[in-house]
């Protein structure tokens, strides 16, 4: 990750056993108090006002802040061997099933160049009529790190489809 102001890197040692890993997949694990429509991938907002980010120019994207990749939450890697992480979670019965497929693949080419890709696919059938969600986000990223120069870049795209039932 990069810092907000000048883009310095946060150094984080990779750990093979993440603590409270199951909380990273649940909506409730993103904050102490979250308001949302009940299924994975639906718009959400923190009920704690100080946790909310500054509003965007396109206000409808604010409810998807937890799903969007921004320069402040994009991860970059510097690995000695190729790294991959694949996660598949499923919740609920057949009529209300929620699924998430999330993956990262990255590899260094030489000592200075790293290239990788992220994928996040969420599909929720919904608990109510016309309450389904389908979110697809992907990102191609790379970085160049030498003694004198550092460059970080990524290209990301998100496609969110939510069915609306007019309120619960």
Task: Give the location of each predicted region.
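Transmembrane beta-barrel architecture of outer-membrane proteins
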Residues: 15-18, 28-33, 99, 121-123, ...
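Outer-membrane beta-barrel channels and translocator barrels
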Residues: 79, 110, 145-149
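Acidic, small-polar-rich N-terminal luminal/periplasmic segments of exported/outer-membrane proteins
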Residues: 1-80
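Surface-exposed extracellular loop regions of Gram-negative outer-membrane beta-barrel proteins
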Residues: 100-141
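Outer-membrane beta-barrel translocator/channel fold
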Residues: 35, 127-137, 141-168
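Transmembrane beta-barrel strands of outer-membrane/channel proteins
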Residues: 86-90, 119-121, 153-157
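Transmembrane beta-strands of outer-membrane beta-barrel proteins
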Residues: 84, 115, 149-153
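Short strand-turn segments of transmembrane beta-barrel domains in outer membranes
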Residues: 56-62, 70-105, 126-128
């Amino acid at each position: 990750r990069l810092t907000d102001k000048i883009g310095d890197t946060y150094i984080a040692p990779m750990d093979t056993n993440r603590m409270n890993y199951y909380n990273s997949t649940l909506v409730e694990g993103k904050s102490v108090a979250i308001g949302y429509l009940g299924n994975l991938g639906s718009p959400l907002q923190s009920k704690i006002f100080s946790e909310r980010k500054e509003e965007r120019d396109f206000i409808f994207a604010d409810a998807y802040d937890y799903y969007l990749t921004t320069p402040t939450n994009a991860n970059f890697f510097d690995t000695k061997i190729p790294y991959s992480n694949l996660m598949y979670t499923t919740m609920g019965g057949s009529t209300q099933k929620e699924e998430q497929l999330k993956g990262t693949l990255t590899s260094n080419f030489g000592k200075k160049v790293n290239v990788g890709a992220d994928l996040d696919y969420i599909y929720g059938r919904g608990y109510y009529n016309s309450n389904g969600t389908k979110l697809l986000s992907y990102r191609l990223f790379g970085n160049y790190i030498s003694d004198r120069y550092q460059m970080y870049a990524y290209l990301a795209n998100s496609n969110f489809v939510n069915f609306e039932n007019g309120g619960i």
